[in-house]
Amino acid sequence: MWFDVHTHQLSACPSEAIFNCEGSYIPMPGEAAFLSVGIHPWYLSKENYSHRLHEVEALIKHDKRVVAVGEAGLDKYAEAPFALQEEAFRAMCFLAEQYRLPLIIHSVKTYNELMALKKALHPSQSWIIHGFRGKKELAQSLVRQGFYLSFGEHYHPDALAVLPEDTFLLETDESCVPIKELYRRAASIRGRELMPFAVRMEQLVNSLFFNR
């Protein structure tokens, strides 16, 4: 009911969260029912790129818990050369298409680049920008271009308030705020009763991650 689409913490309800795998740590099945895996620009280098790409694809192929590719993305503040970031991001896009999985995106100061890549690549799988904190005008522009947005603990309330309900998701990311509280806050911002709002969100989660 209170599905968390992106978290770095093991959930008390493993069947209601997508745990983001980083590095070589893979939780046991009893700890996490669903996983995402990708190459994060923070942890990317010329030396580890080929190895990480192999690791990511191997996990997608062999662990049925993987329901999304990511985090993957572009970050103007990351140490990795931007050209390498883009190469890795394109590789993650390819894996998302090949294995028919949604793509969870990390973006810092790179929305223009993301929009250009989406137009160039014409992906058939969903692109979900996680931890979105932009203003409502940017949110509306991204949604018009087919992106989904995922909101965590911190965001502009007016951005969440104006979006169609089938275009955004909720996540804890690294926050200690319970996911149910984030649902409560979002429902309040949108003037919705909590339970009907949660049911509508569950329908979107199912359509994006579990309709295969």
Identify the role of each PLM range.
Residues 1-212:
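Mid-domain alpha/beta scaffold segments of enzyme catalytic cores
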